[in-house]
Amino acid sequence: MEIPKSHDEWLQLRLKGIGGSEAAAVIGQSPWCSNVELWKRKTGRATAPDISNNEAVQYGHDAEPLIRGLFAIDNAHKYKTEYLGEFDMVYHPKYPFIFATLDGRLTELETGRRGILEVKTTSIVRSMQKEQWWKDGKPCIPQQYFIQVLHQLLATGWDFAVLHAQLKYEYGDNPDDIRTERRSYLIERSDHLEDLEYLEEKEVYFWTENVEKDICPGMILPEI
């Protein structure tokens, strides 16, 4: 584990590998960044936009410790919840360019198993956004967040992850009618071994064959 002393130092360290929020871009599943754009950023040809002043980003940053605290209280019978630090970075034991900054570390009280806590906040202002969290009438995780959790499991080697999301509904006729809902999704490492192997293979190839050799990857278009 490495503990950067500042946000700027953390950003510089992120240039040396692939972080959790970037994993989906490697395989063409990010709605915000293509694999080619990510390659440009990692090779110094482009700079990631500064989104620190974005209202949704600020809300998520400020809400995270509160939501993590509520999760810890609600699940005190099941998990010990720990906060590692805002900039603490956990590295893959074999591939140090695969790393993660975690929202929390969980210890399952009954078994002692280690797990990841990933906190998400999202504002749903139209019905199409709600559909990302529902599939066939059942709650689900948006693909880019699922890939982020898989990446974190790769970096840590831990047994499971819990994605704890607050959904804030803001669409409707009344702008003051805001409802919130919190959901927890359990992702077991043992249930996704093939997915983990696939993601690791793609991330290793992207870094060693594209970034380190300075060869632009072919553009991966998202499935429609």
Regions found by a protein language model. Name each.
Residues 1-62, 66:
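Charged, glycine-rich intrinsically disordered N-terminal tails and low-complexity linkers that flank
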Residues 57-83:
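Acidic-basic catalytic patches of nuclease active cores, encompassing PD-(D/E)XK
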Residues 73-102, 106-211:
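Nucleic-acid nuclease catalytic cores
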